[in-house]
């Protein structure tokens, strides 16, 4: 076991604070509309330029083990806020630094760290309640665009694109962000349910120019197992042929005699047909087939529920207005499912999302939810260089996350203003002087984001904060972009409540733990062994 080095008391806290300050000082220059960029060196490829707080925090690793502990604890504040709200990481870092700085001073003045923590926790609870009380629900597409624009650092085109995407696929819809191959940023919306399985044979193609299968008003056979035997499939094929409608078969696989017959049938101009593999694997495949059945008002043909393929009637098949099948994807547009049944299925998936502890399962459930509830939108971020595209993609990701958070819990004025107002309204009392001091730490720390935004814009922070607090209106604040005092909400300067709340809660949680630290243990760095000396002397009889 390697030897350990131990630091105690004031010495330990000072080293922690030094690490916190190094990380926070690198991150906080990015805060606000006039925040600066940070350039991050990469071991391969071009350096990365970003204004995203968590991206900067994740790159910082300090040489001194004790200082690094402080930096990593503060990095956790940014990461946790990013996981919960997807934005507000820089605000969380600034708040965390302010709470640690004030807390270390209080502990140095012989106050009880545990009582300080209790005071901090009580104050945070009161501030969060105040934020919820003042929150304004988002109703219009314009308000969604405003939130997205602020988080994208004032880029109105990004704000409008995200608002359009949310309008088209709904609040539950999946919106993904990808890097484009061109210089333009564009939005592509896939309506209906799409899954990543294409046609099993190119002979099914109806549009040879685009190599697509287009089926209008088809029946949809949803089968859980493999289809290889033709005899069991014949009754369904005959019934569909008599109706004159096309047929889409979704099954685990279609092979052998069954596939050959379907292809020959299509080539002879008999039945307009296509077959695709079922999406997903195992239990997830079963669930997705059920989703397709609900969406198209069909039934999953499965021997588990006692339905044999030879007994299937047309009433058991799903219906849709259109189906498009490419080499790699299948899209079902405007399924015939009952709205009430689809809503019940959506509620069931939402309940599963709440219960799951696996991030992977949650992501897959959200994908299923989106496919049922609305559709999928893809924002392709373009730019002239790879560095520009990556920087822009960071901003689009932040804007998208902030917008989702705003729809969920509502909005408050931006620019750190609600935290300033909450500090003024913080009237709770502690049970003893040390708890009072903990409440005071939060009261002072709440000013830090607004001060940092002003400082990054080259303004005198104390003057800006003073003028904002002189006005009694909750929505009055300072617009750093235009250097004007005004009603922030009417000008679209807003922040999602979820972002502000998560930033404060996570900052206080980690910072109060740092304050209560009394000892630190780290491994003693190993001394590098000196390289062996080169053997002396040259080769005999050789002159150089």
From Swiss-Prot:
Species whose genome carries this gene: Bartonella bacilliformis
Any one GO molecular-function label of the UniProt entry: unfolded protein binding
Reactions mediated catalytically: ATP + H2O + a folded polypeptide = ADP + phosphate + an unfolded polypeptide
Classification via CDD domains: GroEL
HAMAP family found in the cross-reference section: CH60 (MF_00600)
InterPro entries in the record: Chaperonin_Cpn60_CS (IPR018370), Cpn60/GroEL (IPR001844), Cpn60/GroEL/TCP-1 (IPR002423), GroEL-like_apical_dom_sf (IPR027409), GROEL-like_equatorial_sf (IPR027413), TCP-1-like_intermed_sf (IPR027410)
Protein family per UniProt: Belongs to the chaperonin (HSP60) family.
Function field: Together with its co-chaperonin GroES, plays an essential role in assisting protein folding. The GroEL-GroES system forms a nano-cage that allows encapsulation of the non-native substrate proteins and provides a physical environment optimized to promote and accelerate protein folding.
Highest taxon of source: Bacteria
Subunit structure: Forms a cylinder of 14 subunits composed of two heptameric rings stacked back-to-back. Interacts with the co-chaperonin GroES.
Primary localization: cytoplasm
Gene expressing this chain: groEL
NCBIfam families noted in UniProt: GroEL, PRK00013.1, PRK12849.1, PRK12850.1, PRK12851.1
Enzyme Commission number(s): 5.6.1.7
PROSITE patterns named in the record: CHAPERONINS_CPN60
One GO term of the biological process aspect: protein refolding
Binding site residues for ATP: 30-33, 51, 87-91, 415, 495
Enzyme class: isomerase
Localization: Cytoplasm
Residues spanning the signal sequence: none
Miscellaneous: This protein is a major antigen in patients with bartonellosis, an infectious disease endemic in high altitude valleys of the Andes.
SUPFAM superfamilies, per database record: GroEL apical domain-like, GroEL equatorial domain-like, GroEL-intermediate domain like
Protein name: Chaperonin GroEL
């Amino acid at each position: 076991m390697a030897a350990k080095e131990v630091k105690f008391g004031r010495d330990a806290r000072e080293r922690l604070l030094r690490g916190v300050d190094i990380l926070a000082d690198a991150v906080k220059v990015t805060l606000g509309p006039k925040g600066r960029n940070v350039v991050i060196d990469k071991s391969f490829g071009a350096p990365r330029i970003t204004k995203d707080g968590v991206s900067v925090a994740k790159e910082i690793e300090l040489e001194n083990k004790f200082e690094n502990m402080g930096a990593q604890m503060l990095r956790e504040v940014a990461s946790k806020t990013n996981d919960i709200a997807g934005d507000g990481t820089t605000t969380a870092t600034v708040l965390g630094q302010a709470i640690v700085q004030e807390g270390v001073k209080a502990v140095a003045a012989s106050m009880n760290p545990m009582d300080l923590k209790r005071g901090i926790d009580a104050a945070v609870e009161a501030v969060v309640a105040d934020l919820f009380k003042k929150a304004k629900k988002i109703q219009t597409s314009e308000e969604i665009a405003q939130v997205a624009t602020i988080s994208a650092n004032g880029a109105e085109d990004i704000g409008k694109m995200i608002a359009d995407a949310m309008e088209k696929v709904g609040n539950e819809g999946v919106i993904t962000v990808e890097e484009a191959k061109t210089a333009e940023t564009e939005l592509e919306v896939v309506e209906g349910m799409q899954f990543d399985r294409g046609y099993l044979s190119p002979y099914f193609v109806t549009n040879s120019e685009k190599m697509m299968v287009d089926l209008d008003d088809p029946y949809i056979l949803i089968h859980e197992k493999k289809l290889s035997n033709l005899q069991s499939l014949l009754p369904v094929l005959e019934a569909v042929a008599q109706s004159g409608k096309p047929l889409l078969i979704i099954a685990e696989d279609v092979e052998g005699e069954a596939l050959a017959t379907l292809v020959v049938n299509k080539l002879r101009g008999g039945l307009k047909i296509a077959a695709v593999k079922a999406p997903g694997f195992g239990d997830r495949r079963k669930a997705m087939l059920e989703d397709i059945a609900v969406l198209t008002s069909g039934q999953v043909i499965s021997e588990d529920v006692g339905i044999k393929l030879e007994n299937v009637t047309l009433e058991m098949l799903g219906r849709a207005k259109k189906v498009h099948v490419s080499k790699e994807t299948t899209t079902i547009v405007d399924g015939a499912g009952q709205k009430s049944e689809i809503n019940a299925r959506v509620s069931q998936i939402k309940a599963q999302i709440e219960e799951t502890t696996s991030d992977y399962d949650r992501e897959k459930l959200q994908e299923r939810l989106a496919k049922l509830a609305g559709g999928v939108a893809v924002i392709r971020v373009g730019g002239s260089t790879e560095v520009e595209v990556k920087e822009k993609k960071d901003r689009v990701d932040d804007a998208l996350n902030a917008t989702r958070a705003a729809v969920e819990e509502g909005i408050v004025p931006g620019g750190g203003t609600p935290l300033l107002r909450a500090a003024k309204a913080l009237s709770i009392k502690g049970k003893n002087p040390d708890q009072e001091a903990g409440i005071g730490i939060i009261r002072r720390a709440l000013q830090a984001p607004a001060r940092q935004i002003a400082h990054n814009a080259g303004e005198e922070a104390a003057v800006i904060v003073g003028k904002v607090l002189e006005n009694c209106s909750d929505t009055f604040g300072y617009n750093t972009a235009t250097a004007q005092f005004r009603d922030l909400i009417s000008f679209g300067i807003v922040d999602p409540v979820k972002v502000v709340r998560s930033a404060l809660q996570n900052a206080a949680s980690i910072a109060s733990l740092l304050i209560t630290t009394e000892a630190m243990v780290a491994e003693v760095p190993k001394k590098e062994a000196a390289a062996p000396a080169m053997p002396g002397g040259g080769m005999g009889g050789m002159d150089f």
